[in-house]
């Protein structure tokens, strides 16, 4: 009987805090790697198992001379210093080896400490090892008490669904003791749910020589498991435990018993799984070679030509071989892992890495037992040394995975006579890794796409480890990377009739026999082959997205699984959105042309191209289509293929792609036909498609500015700093800006920074310099009017210029203004230059933002999904009532840029929807206190600079804002420029993390459910009304609606929209909210949707703020006198102050509960009049008709004045 071996680790005991890395169950062991053995031959083994690197010469240090007073002080201090070096003990041999390991293997001591701490937290507690040992002893005694006999009907259902059932099974008690297998045996159990696998071998007496045929072995195995389970339930030792059946690896032929102990101290995190196996000598060795058939067509009542060879059942054969060879394979693993802490820890690291990427799930999963076997293989090949550290083990495995090809086969079996047979066996599988017996392919069920994905992830891990500028630990081990966040599109088919139709009409008989009629792998093969052929280079990978099968009570019937399928498509951004699929020439290759025409059906047409060739081709769109339309080309192709080849209806297919692009589309309420412009605008256009129009207009304006004659100073550079220039403006920018009564009206202004040539004539006084700048701008405006016929208007912020319906705000930047802002004169008359908030804001806007804006524009050019991802993210934050004053827009842009810059996925993000889901994961799981988000644009930051900044961040964390963002252009302000302590605050960050987790829960639930469709945008992009104390409704006719798609308010129903053009650069509501926060942020928090929100939500501070306090002259703001000479802040008084500040915007105030009640009672809140509901109810119908008739004949001017006067009257 196997026992769990207690592992004594050096260092302090594991703490009780929750583990930092995800833990998981598994069936295997540990691992390690040579930091310098990336596919190279292993060098001569040293004492630590890796070649000593050649030491690099140290650069000579520059000597600096201290100023004379300082040097004298230093000498005086040294005079009294004692020489402690003589009292320091030299380092021990173990300490020297540890220091050398840190220098040679790890990036830094931090990475080593993180790995060490994680391994300590993964250590199995003693209470679990003791319980498992005691349970195994008890179970061994139990199996010896079992009695032989005929298995009759019991209360339990046999956990197997087969067409033809056997009868008369005679049970024989085990002749061999139960054994621990997998991770429990090799000492690599992983939590948080610790799963202990136990194998009980069925004796040969239960089986006959012909039981290998037609699923008889599988039925006897299931009957044996059922009998043992029934006996355990009636035994007092297990009667209180919880019993359930489940399918191991989503394989319906592999039922296992899942037992949850009743003992309270282990029941929460411990589960035992019972496997039934058979002796390897039960059947002849050649029965289960891949080319043999062990399920006859007659079993399924199919006819088969006797002269034709029977189809091979290689996958079914591998399923049986798994049981037969389990003991031999486990013995090999135990020999390799037991007593080797380095191998065990290495495998634990690999398990965490694999589980975080969800590549080990389901029928097609790349299980951790494969990784354990691969460690043994590398040890056999002398690529891994027995003394390799755990880090070396993991790194070597990643490196070998990335650089070896298993499609031709590798084997653990002795080399003699295996080469020819190995190549033959490999031809029956996508991936081939033979076990020690040389009969079982450990990767029999792993499809090529999953294997290639594992290789890509392994290569990424090695690249991250090689990047000396990066702390790769969180990216490799800590970040959870669900598979749905790694794919761009998802195909989901859950309709039962569609599944059966595909299996009946399109599954070949050979596939049915090979997988024993299990539908899931057949569907996977049918769909993958079809989509690979149709999409070709448009996709980089097609991956199955599986959910682990759920356990069921032992009294219930075994469920039928595999009746739904979900595939993830990883797109190639370079080819995915091509509008043309060109076939072979009809003259040169008539057969190929006919095949192309047959494959594509009616979509294929004969076309002549500009080069004169005439070929068959399929056109999916035009080159002028908007990017959002082009992102649906792959969806269009997949839907056509499924309909044309598999006869599936579109209503039975869920293709998840670009559902969230809706949020930045133009509102259907706004009619583009009313916009007077020469541009071709479509009603279904969006913010992304409209951005190039603004950029082209800006480019023309920049050329005109450079071409202006007779300017006093030359224009050196012109930079746009508006979000639209970076494709990051979520509101559609239409050419509707107009000049009205000498004022420019526009919903958006595009900010432009102009740098002038050097001159020594600028004044040395700040106000004079700014006056001269204004005069210069006026001259630029006059010349634009005279030479380019452009209208302009001067404001306090700069020069407004109207061009082609777009409004630009020109600002002049001059270094002298920045210097004057920093200038301070001390009491002694000494002039010094000190940073202050105003100077930092000016430096950011005039000098840093233009560079960052250009870098983000370049990022969008290389990753076309970057801009749309920002648009979705900004819309989501706005709908959660987080405006620019709470969450800076640049923080969103830089966080998304961080996602696209960091290499935490093998492939770049091709779909904005996927980018948004990754951003949600970042927001949901980031450690805001410990993470500094670095954006090294153009790799202009050196390794030393990054290290210094990270050291400063860790050592002086309190001087940085809660959300620390740093770009390589920030200079001395790195980490403190884009956010502040209050924008966003730590409380807001926690709030956003909760919102992101909730959004991810909705997304995951919809993806994992067979019945639910993917979440609708209205579910994600509508904030909650919970948690707010008051809601101030604003007059909808004074607050213009946003031009983007309106997904509704969390408080009230839809209202008639208005699209009034405000004065350019004016946002009165944002200004009022800023005033409210400035005056009353100590007493209340204010929230509103900056994208056309009509409500202002208020949340009071804690009650202690409103408690009576002693009278103090300095603390009387918003206070009212109360008893005993004390003062207190009264909420009702604050509300009256809010009304005064809101002035004409205020309509009514209520609580969220009142608004909900009105919605339920269908009493829609009055938006234009602050009238009580009963006022309208008291009116008779005839009176209402008379009022309506009178309103129709009223003059429009009179009606307008009435609408304005009523709310003002109610305020008084």
From Swiss-Prot:
Species annotation: Drosophila persimilis
Keyword Nucleus included in the entry's annotation: yes
Task of the protein: Part of the small subunit (SSU) processome, first precursor of the small eukaryotic ribosomal subunit. During the assembly of the SSU processome in the nucleolus, many ribosome biogenesis factors, an RNA chaperone and ribosomal proteins associate with the nascent pre-rRNA and work in concert to generate RNA folding, modifications, rearrangements and cleavage as well as targeted degradation of pre-ribosomal RNA by the RNA exosome.
Keywords noted in UniProt: Chromosome, Nucleus, RNA-binding
Entry superkingdom: Eukaryota
GO CC terms of this entry: condensed nuclear chromosome; CURI complex; small-subunit processome; UTP-C complex
Family to which the UniProt record says this protein belongs: Belongs to the NRAP family.
Any Pfam family the entry gives: Nrap_D5
The protein, known as: Nucleolar protein 6
Main subcellular location of this protein, as a coarse class: nucleus
InterPro entries in the record: NOL6/Upt22 (IPR005554), Nrap_D1 (IPR035082), Nrap_D2 (IPR035367), Nrap_D3 (IPR035368), Nrap_D4 (IPR035369), Nrap_D5 (IPR035370), Nrap_D6 (IPR035371)
Subunit structure: Part of the small subunit (SSU) processome, composed of more than 70 proteins and the RNA chaperone small nucleolar RNA (snoRNA) U3.
GO molecular function (one): RNA binding
Biased composition (Basic residues): 1197-1212
Gene designation: Mat89Ba
GO terms for biological process, alphabetical: ribosomal small subunit biogenesis; rRNA processing; tRNA export from nucleus
Stretches the record annotates as Disordered: 1-72, 1156-1212
